[in-house]
């Protein structure tokens, strides 16, 4: 009896289990295809035209028709697009994806190569996996619109005084700064971004938003920028998802020293730090739907990219060692993220 006959005789439900067994492959390809829908500007084109023929899309975006038809047909079969005699349009499910572009840009555009390298990087001495730092920054800024920016504004409201000069160390594509400056017209801001691609996108974004007279962008890492001779006296500094990179790459003493330098240079500074509480091994926390959908892959990728996530209590110890006093701490709005895993800290010199 050959293998196929054996399968037929022993398990008449093989097809059912096959469908279930390869469902992750379907979701893998679907996630990548949705990412490309955003990244190629096809999503924006379909929003603009409502219904677009392949010819229109190819002419506007310089694409090859047969390849584009393949992508459109695939997404139609997955319920993301609809097809009529006039062309393709976004379905209700497709339109509903719009707010989530940042998650696709960061996790797929930024870290797809990381996930594909995991096997080889498991080997002793193999080093760290690579990532697309530009996409990581752009995606993170897109996500921040929903979580980190409202969290930061809430913490700002509880600080003494008002924010007039904001320094963002690790500003990504500048979206964070642009949103703050549009919402708070009294603010002057400066952002530092180590990734060349992210820096260039930030400069372009600030110019397009008409904020060049209020926002300055530097191509620099957070530590290097703080050590430089910049002429800016902030009353608030924001470090969003930056310290765990320093912690992973340079160790705890480097993080403590960096924070000490901040309060030494700016004794009256209001310091806002946003990090993710490491609850990767907490079975109760990880049963949450968003914990599985987002934080589970988020925790995983950090194990392979020389970034060290630690627990809330560890951050509080680090802040105390650096001479900082906790004014307050908050998590994200339950309407956006009820896991309590993303934490914002408002700190001042002790």
UniProtKB/Swiss-Prot annotation:
Q: Coiled coil where?
A: none
GO molecular function terms noted in the UniProt entry = S-adenosylmethionine-dependent methyltransferase activity
Which keywords describe this protein according to UniProt? Antibiotic biosynthesis, Methyltransferase, S-adenosyl-L-methionine, Transferase
- How does activity change as temperature rises? Optimum temperature is 45 degrees Celsius.
This protein's pathway reads: Antibiotic biosynthesis
Q: What happens when the gene is disrupted?
A: Disruption mutant cannot produce MeArg.
User: In what way does activity depend on pH?
Assistant: Optimum pH is 9.
UniProt entry tagged with the keyword ATP-binding: no
* Metal-binding found in the keyword field: no
- What biological process terms from GO does the record include? antibiotic biosynthetic process; methylation
This protein's source sits in the domain of life called Bacteria
Q: Which EC number(s) does the record attach to this protein?
A: 2.1.1.243
CDD domains the record matches: AdoMet_MTases
Catalytic activity line of the entry: 5-guanidino-2-oxopentanoate + S-adenosyl-L-methionine = (3R)-5-guanidino-3-methyl-2-oxopentanoate + S-adenosyl-L-homocysteine + H(+)
**Summary of the function given for this chain in its UniProt record:** S-adenosyl-L-methionine-dependent methyltransferase involved in the formation of the rare amino acid 3-methylarginine (MeArg), which is used as a potent antibiotic against the closely related soybean pathogen P.syringae pv. glycinea. Transfers the methyl group from S-adenosyl-L-methionine into 5-guanidino-2-oxopentanoate acid to yield 5-guanidino-3-methyl-2-oxopentanoate, a precursor of MeArg.
Q: Which family does the UniProt entry place this protein in?
A: Belongs to the 2-ketoarginine methyltransferase family.
Q: What is this protein called?
A: 2-ketoarginine methyltransferase
């Amino acid at each position: 009896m050959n293998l196929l006959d054996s399968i037929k005789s022993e398990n008449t439900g093989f097809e059912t289990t096959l469908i279930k067994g390869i469902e992750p492959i379907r979701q893998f390809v679907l996630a990548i295809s949705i990412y490309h829908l955003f990244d190629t500007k096809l999503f924006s084109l379909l929003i603009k035209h409502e219904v677009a023929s392949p010819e229109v899309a190819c002419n506007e975006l310089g694409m090859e028709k047969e390849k584009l038809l393949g992508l459109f047909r695939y997404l139609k079969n997955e319920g993301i697009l609809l097809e009529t005699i006039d062309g393709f349009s976004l379905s209700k499910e497709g339109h509903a994806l719009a707010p989530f572009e940042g998650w696709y840009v960061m996790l797929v555009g930024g870290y797809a190569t990381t996930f594909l390298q995991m096997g080889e990087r498991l080997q002793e001495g193999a080093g760290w996996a690579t990532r697309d730092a530009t996409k990581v920054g752009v995606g993170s800024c897109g996500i921040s619109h929903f979580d980190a920016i409202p969290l930061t504004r809430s913490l700002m409201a509880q600080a003494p005084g008002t924010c007039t000069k904001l320094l963002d160390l690790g500003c990504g594509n500048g979206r964070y700064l642009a949103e703050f400056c549009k919402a708070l017209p009294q603010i002057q801001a400066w952002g530092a971004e180590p990734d060349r691609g992210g820096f260039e996108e930030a400069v372009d974004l600030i110019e397009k938003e008409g904020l060049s007279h209020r926002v300055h962008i530097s191509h620099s890492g957070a530590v290097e920028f703080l050590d430089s001779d910049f002429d800016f006296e902030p009353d608030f500094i924001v470090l969003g998802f930056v310290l765990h990179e320093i912690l992973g790459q340079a160790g705890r003493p480097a993080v403590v020293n960096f924070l000490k330098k901040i309060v030494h240079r700016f004794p009256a500074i209001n310091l806002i730090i946003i990090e993710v509480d490491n609850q990767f091994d907490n079975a109760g926390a990880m049963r949450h739907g968003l914990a599985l959908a987002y934080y589970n892959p988020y925790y995983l990728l950090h194990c392979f990219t020389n970034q060290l996530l630690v627990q809330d209590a560890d951050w509080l110890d680090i802040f105390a060692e650096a001479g900082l006093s906790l004014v307050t701490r908050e998590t994200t709005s339950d309407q956006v993220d009820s896991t309590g895993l993303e934490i914002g800290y408002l700190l001042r010199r002790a």
